[in-house]
Amino acid sequence: MDVDLLPLRKRITNTFKLCGFLIRSENSSYLAEQLLPFDAAERDKWLTVITENLQSQKLLTPHVERAALEKAINELNRVGLDEGETVFALIDAFTVPRFRYNQRIKKFELDTQPRQLLTAPRMKSDYMQQRYAMLLQKTLRHDLFAPAVIQDGVGAEAQAKKFKLQFAENLLATSAMKEAVVLGLLTQLKEGKFYVEDPTGCVQLDLTGARFHAGFFCEGCFVLAEGNYNNGVLKVDGLGFPPAEPANSSRAFFGTANTWGGESAKLLKYSAGLQELERTNTETTIVFLSDVRLDLPVVMEKLRQLFVGYDSCPPQAIVLMGPFTASTRNHHELRHHLDALGGLAAGCEQLKKQTDLILVPSSEDPTAPNILPRAPIPECLAAGLLKAWPRTQLATNPCRLQYCTQQIVVCRLDLMAKFCRNTLHFPEDTSQIEQHFARTIVCQGHLVPIHPIAMPVHWDYDPALWLYPLPDLIVMGDSCQSFSSSQHGCTVLNTGSFVKSKFAFKVYIPATRTIEDSEIPDELE
């Protein structure tokens, strides 16, 4: 490698001198590594535009530092994009913006109040009220609940049947009401007795003979309960979820605000430059693996094969989800295995230069409590990996990805088992279990719509778990069988377990929005 770099370094030094710049050997080596994949003609073109960019920076001295080179390369890679627009970004869950619904103007407004892990006691109810407000406003817009209008001389009663949403206080103020529909939190205030609760009160439910719609109805989720109310009890005929809403319809109530997170002040979903890049970059892929046990030698060998195989065609990112070791307390063991992970890519120079390696911890990985959002693996444990693979990024769980205009949520959680253990009614059609799973989180607009005892969340950072507006792709790292399902323009993908599924993983192709099933085969003897 050094032999190849030597003439290129000389070429860089001479070109910079002709333009009035001086460059140190370590900086010329850095630039040579960036230009090495190109042929001679392309290298000359890049050198020309880089020196022109450096001249436009109006440096204070003729000495070109590493920061100036990186700025020039980044700006040239973003030609055609506006300020703040990035092709690919990892978004920390603790930086996701929080919005509150303003009932008066019927819009979501950015909440700029500071947030903290040990927050005020009032947030225990406030975060659930905000989740309720989000579901209420989209439910009231749905065709089944929106006020009827006269169209072409046809009266409201001749059109499709409409429902009027009732609040708990409306039912509690009367002794009987037929065909009542209530939106609220499904909760068990007394043992064996379930209630639907909203900010105005709670109503006891009689679920005997109730017809359950598709999905997992767990305590802690929001439901639409339809039935006849009499003497303080709602005899439920049907129990369903709040209706899902396409992302395009939801975004209209946020204006141009960046609801996704990241550095851009506006939402990148409508960027013409990024849309064009997304369309033309047909070879770009993102690789997802879950349950990557670095303490198992066979897993390390399969990862080595994966890295070597992708070195000739590097993906945009490789996302590895935990647990990374069996031990939850031995921090030194995890550091040792992360160092070894960096060593696996020792000969994969193109992969390390062009691919982001993203590590998403599970609840079993050390240093953070089992509460969502979960903090990333500490940098001190991944120092060796960060040195060996500089493009490594330590992510929160969950985290968000932005590729061009596409929005991707990544979460490592065994959620299917939690749903199955806590649901009031198990779906009868078990062959479509993945459809029930996808419908539950899409309709709830939340990653973990279950009781806080089953999955605690940080109250102040609950918006990081929202799925509203719906993203393009939700990637769950669940150890159950892999699947994918599309709901209202959103694809829900479960990667399955890398260890338990004969080393299978998923490859997402953003240009076509398709998912490929891949597997690392046994090497031929």
Curated annotation (Swiss-Prot):
Q: Where in the cell is it found?
A: Nucleus
- Does the entry feature the keyword Nucleotide-binding, yes or no? no
Please name the InterPro entries in this protein's record: DNA_pol_a/d/e_bsu, DNA_pol_e_bsu_N, POLE2
A single Pfam family, by name?
A: DNA_pol_E_B
Phenotype upon gene inactivation: Pupal lethal. Results in smaller eye, leg and wing disk, brain lobe and salivary glands. Results in defective entry and/or progression though S phase during the cell cycle in eye imaginal disk cells. Results in defective endoreplication in salivary glands.
Indicate where this protein is primarily found. Answer: nucleus
Q: Which GO terms describe its molecular function?
A: DNA binding
An example Gene Ontology CC term for this record: epsilon DNA polymerase complex
The protein's UniProt keywords, in alphabetical order, are: DNA replication, DNA-binding, Nucleus
Fill in the subunit field for this protein. Component of the epsilon DNA polymerase complex consisting of four subunits: the catalytic subunit PolE1/DNApol-epsilon255 and the accessory subunits PolE2/DNApol-epsilon58, Chrac-14/DNApolE3 and PolE4.
Listed name of the protein: DNA polymerase epsilon subunit 2
Q: Origin organism of this chain?
A: Drosophila melanogaster (Fruit fly)
| Highest classification ranks of the organism | Eukaryota, Metazoa, Ecdysozoa, Arthropoda, Hexapoda
